[in-house]
């Protein structure tokens, strides 16, 4: 069992190269993630066990609580479909990896919005730190529950 942690911080890193795909890395405290998945799905997720049941539970949870939207010249709030790649455990945290299919259709968009409600269903003081990198330009912000959305203009 892990020691009590007095912080409730998740990190999202989005890499967006024009004409290529989106790569997303999410870092969450493992115990909180397991509790959140159980509360939302009644499934006991074990981050240390890489099996199909855990993959389905984690993928479903992330897809319900984390979304990326882009907009630009002629398009408004297009949700970027993200595919679950996998996860790994690092000490008391779990890293989750997602990516989009080819982003060749997203060349002219210059606005990105990220909705991040991960762990909001179990923690009242959850903080999300969000970093977005586009073509080498990094922008960062944070949201504190009950807020859940951050936007960047490029």
Go through each PLM region and give its residues.
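N-terminal soluble domains immediately following signal/targeting peptides that reside
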Residues: 3-154
């Amino acid at each position: 069992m892990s020691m009590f942690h007095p912080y409730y911080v998740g990190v999202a890193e989005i890499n967006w190269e024009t004409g290529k795909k989106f790569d997303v890395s999410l870092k969450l405290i493992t115990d909180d993630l397991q509790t959140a998945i159980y509360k939302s799905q009644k499934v006991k997720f074990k981050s240390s066990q890489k099996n199909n049941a855990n993959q389905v539970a984690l993928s479903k949870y992330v897809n319900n609580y984390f979304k990326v939207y882009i907009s630009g010249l002629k398009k408004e709030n297009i949700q970027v479909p993200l595919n679950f790649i996998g996860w790994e455990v690092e000490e008391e945290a779990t890293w989750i990896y997602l990516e989009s299919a080819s982003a060749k259709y997203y060349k002219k968009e210059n606005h990105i919005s990220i909705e991040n409600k991960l762990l909001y269903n179990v923690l009242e003081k959850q903080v999300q730190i969000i970093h977005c990198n586009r073509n080498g330009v990094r922008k960062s912000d944070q949201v504190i529950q009950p807020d859940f959305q951050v936007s960047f203009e490029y």
